[in-house]
Amino acid sequence: MAALEAERERLVLRRFSYEDAWQLGILVRELAVERAAPVVIDVRHGARQVFRCALPGSSADNDAWIDRKRRVAERYAAPSFLVGARFRAKGTTFEDASRLDPNSYAAHGGSYPVSVEGVGIVGTVTVSGLPQAEDHALVVEALTRWVNPRAHQGG
């Protein structure tokens, strides 16, 4: 869990405009296409959906998962994967202990709050279609590249 907390601290953006949200969505899509990942991608600036894409092999169920995971990231101001891990670390589950409707909230990996330096959380990026750890990893890879693009140039 410490690694998830540290990851959260380093994935802070300098800014996040509507154009940034769109370009981040494109980056997530490019990474997903490279892997032939059957995912749905959702990027929000505040409450506004700026980017949404469904790739081959994904389903309408993934759309529902996007919404449920995003609600957790928004409510807890933390990645949905981390929220689930926090509950498990206490010896319980999100479903048993959160008192939130599991039809509306899911603490499964794949939704990440977008945080801006000196501002706080300004949006979310969410992926659904892979096992939860892989959904989370895809979002983290995209955010890592976004925060430090030079580290990923040239292979």
Say what each PLM segment does.
Residues 96-144:
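Extended hydrophobic
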Residues 18-22, 88-96, 148-154:
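Short, positively charged
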Residues 74-76, 136-155:
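Short, solvent-exposed cationic patches
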Residues 42, 61, 133-134, 153:
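Short amphipathic alpha-helical leader/targeting segments
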Residues 34-35, 117-118, 145-150:
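Secondary-structure boundary elements
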Residues 1-59:
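Intrinsically disordered, low-complexity terminal regulatory regions
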Residues 36-100:
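Structured interaction and signal-relay segments at domain junctions
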